[in-house]
Amino acid sequence: MPLSLLQFGSLKIWAPLVNLMVIPIMTFLYIPVLLLTLLLAGFSGYIPNFLVSYLTYISQLFWEFLDYFAQLDHVAWGWPIHGFWSFVLLTLAAAIILLPKAVPQRQWAFLIMIIALWPSDQTLPKNHFRAEFFDVGQGTSVLISTQNHHLLYDVGARFPSGFNMAEAVILPILRQLHIEQLDTVILSHDDNDHAGSYPDLAQGIVINQVLSTDGLHQACIVGRHWQWDGVRFDVLSPYNLYPNFKNNSSCVLKVSTATTSLLLTGDIEQAVEYRLIQQHTDDIKADVLLIPHHGSNTSSTPEFVTAVRPKIAINSSGAYNQFKHPTEQVKAVYENLNIPMIDTQNSGRITLTTSLKAKAEYKVKQFRQQNPRFWRR
């Protein structure tokens, strides 16, 4: 239970009951028969048909039973715990509760549990924002949070198997951050790696508004701008809805405060980069740049990167991806301009927070650097 809260930010209420039912069935009705079947096969080479039928029947019942309870999302208790020590405290509390009743210290378990589950304050001050660049493999998903609002820029991919980045990555992190609704979701364009998991996201959280360039939602086009808690949001491209333009129809969003700015570029290619240089020369300047098109050779022209003049460039790409993003050519562009470059495939989730200190405009945290594991060495 503590491990489920740590990893997934929620706990299925039915989980203890399911374990009480499944473990005895597997222990007494399935595993002994399976071992007997293996022994018969090993010594005689013959497996009675009734044993195979029995094991198949039990397996089918087992998976149907688990699948039924897996669909009961509405009975999931969402209460994420924060960090390793909260996990340790919750595990300690669970162990104390299991002690014999005669042990006088059992009442301390509930106090320890309250401390472990006490929510941390994630509220930002006015005029500041936090950007979470999620590790969604070869795709993009960025959460922008202000004091009272949340925007999700792209949602990652969905695969034919049903596996999707909304359920695997985005929703668990939103629960961990105690985010119960999204004010706006922007689907930069309709490629699967940017918009594929939207249906799964919409089933898992309340979404107040969707902006896109595919004509199916409110239009994410030049001229749309708004302000949340002292943070300004400006759409810099496209000028109209051109779904057939694919990558070049990407919604380009600039997020800015008085001290820090972030430019989110989707999958724009060279043609749009040059147009932005010509028509938004001052607007595209930003402290932090989300590298266009995951670091493909189609984008990140030296002229565009020079015009943006970022102090740091963040790339969202999958480890060992088939496109070899970011390419050596793109990495050379940023290196030649002395712009530090970090990538989700190496850093995992990347968190950018505008700083409260006057001398520092922002701070960047890389999940894997802060949470090293021996198997990543």
Regions found by a protein language model. Give the residues of each.
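Internal transmembrane alpha-helical bundles of multi-pass membrane proteins
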Residues: 1-90, 276, 283-284, 288, ...
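Active-site HxH/HxHxD metal-binding segment of metal-dependent hydrolases
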Residues: 186, 190-223, 310
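Glycine- and aromatic-enriched alpha-helical transmembrane segments of multi-pass membrane proteins
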Residues: 71-131
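Conserved beta-strand hairpin/beta-sheet module of binuclear metal-dependent hydrolase folds
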Residues: 32-35, 126-173, 181, 246-269
